[in-house]
């Protein structure tokens, strides 16, 4: 586990009831880009004994910007605990961190949140910034300050 991932887990864990953990994920692809939650939920409908998994893709520190990109993400696991991701992804150096509290929060607050996918994050100089992209304009990213890594901050509740 890289230092960036370890730091993120330490910072997020106090806000999550379930333990966060790094998991090994097989990159399968084949589904729609930039649609991870729908891809994961579609797989649940298409396959037996498969469940959606929520969490994060923690990328390595970018030496040019001094930033760490932490992307909120959905993937799947089978009944044996094998994790796999059907969303095409360019982040082959990212570490997958399972955070099932994101799913629980999104499910309980479905009608009050804009998206069932949490805000992605940028970490620099000890500060986390929430980042949202407009899926109609992929290159448009809005940043907002957050006071903690609590679910209500990550989902704009």
Which residue stretches match the model-derived regions?
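A structural boundary/capping signal
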Residues: 1-157
């Amino acid at each position: 586990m890289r230092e960036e991932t370890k730091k993120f887990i330490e910072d997020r864990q106090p806000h999550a009831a379930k333990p966060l953990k790094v998991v090994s994920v097989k990159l399968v692809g084949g589904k729609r880009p930039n649609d991870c939650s729908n891809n994961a939920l579609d797989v649940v409908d298409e396959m037996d004994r498969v469940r959606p998994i929520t969490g994060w893709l923690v990328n390595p520190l970018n030496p040019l910007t001094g930033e760490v990109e932490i992307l909120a993400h959905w993937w799947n696991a089978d009944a044996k605990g094998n994790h796999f991701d059907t969303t095409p992804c360019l982040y082959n150096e990212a570490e997958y961190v399972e955070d099932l509290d994101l799913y629980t929060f999104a499910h309980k607050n479905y009608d009050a949140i804009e998206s069932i996918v949490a805000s992605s994050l940028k970490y620099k100089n000890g500060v986390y910034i929430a980042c949202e992209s407009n899926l109609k304009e992929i290159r448009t990213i809005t940043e907002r300050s957050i006071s903690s890594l609590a679910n209500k901050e990550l989902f704009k509740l």
